[in-house]
């Protein structure tokens, strides 16, 4: 995937809820920008690099992502405190660790989602064929965005889908 610059209208000013200081400015989006993001995500899905990757490959990528979340847990916790005012103890205890655990859970799901079928009569072939469906839109809330983002991204990516994320304006970092 990739982050898109784009944006329309006035930028969204990211203000620290702690002291009111200006953290950064982000591009604002509109329906056309969302449509473009979905088109790009669909093209990425259709090229098959992720959607047709063997489950073991997706599993390895999700585990690597969890490793990176854990390795950068302190920085991510501080970012959550500065961005949306998460209480510092909660930020360190809950969010990065929960996000990493969620990503690891779905990494392990990658090669275990094939299920079983009920017995069928002689001469009848029963099958389950599971495949990614395409592009998933994930709207991330302001409260615990890293953790809840992992709840949405983990299952979608584990199944081979592409994802377009809509972060909250009040916790967009």
Set out the residue ranges of the language-model regions.
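Glycine-rich loop-to-alpha-helix module at the N-terminal edge of alpha/beta enzyme cores
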Residues: 23-113
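Single, functionally critical "micro-switch" positions that shape active/binding sites
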Residues: 15, 53, 159
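Residue-level signal for pocket-adjacent positions within structured domains
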Residues: 18-21, 45-48, 83-86, 108, ...
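Residues that cap or flank secondary-structure elements
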Residues: 8, 68, 91, 144-145, ...
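Terminal low-complexity tails and localization/encapsulation signals of metabolic enzymes
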Residues: 1-26, 60-64, 113-139
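Conserved small-residue-rich beta-alpha loop and adjacent elements
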Residues: 116-173
């Amino acid at each position: 995937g990739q982050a898109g610059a784009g944006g329309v209208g006035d930028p969204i000013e990211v203000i620290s809820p702690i002291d009111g200081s200006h953290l950064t400015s982000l591009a604002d989006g509109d329906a056309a920008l969302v449509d473009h993001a979905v088109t790009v995500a669909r093209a990425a899905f259709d090229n098959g690099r992720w959607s047709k990757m063997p489950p073991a490959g997706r599993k390895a990528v999700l585990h690597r992502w969890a490793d990176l979340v854990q390795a950068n847990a302190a920085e991510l916790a501080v970012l959550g405190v500065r961005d949306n005012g998460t209480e510092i103890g909660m930020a360190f205890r809950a969010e990065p660790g929960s996000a990493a655990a969620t990503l690891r859970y779905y990494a392990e799901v990658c090669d275990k989602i094939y299920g079983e079928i009920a017995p069928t009569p002689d001469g009848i072939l029963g099958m389950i064929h599971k495949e990614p469906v395409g592009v998933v839109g994930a709207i991330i809330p302001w409260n615990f965005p890293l953790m809840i983002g992992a709840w949405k991204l983990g299952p979608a990516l584990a199944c081979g889908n592409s994802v377009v994320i809509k972060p909250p304006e009040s916790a967009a970092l």
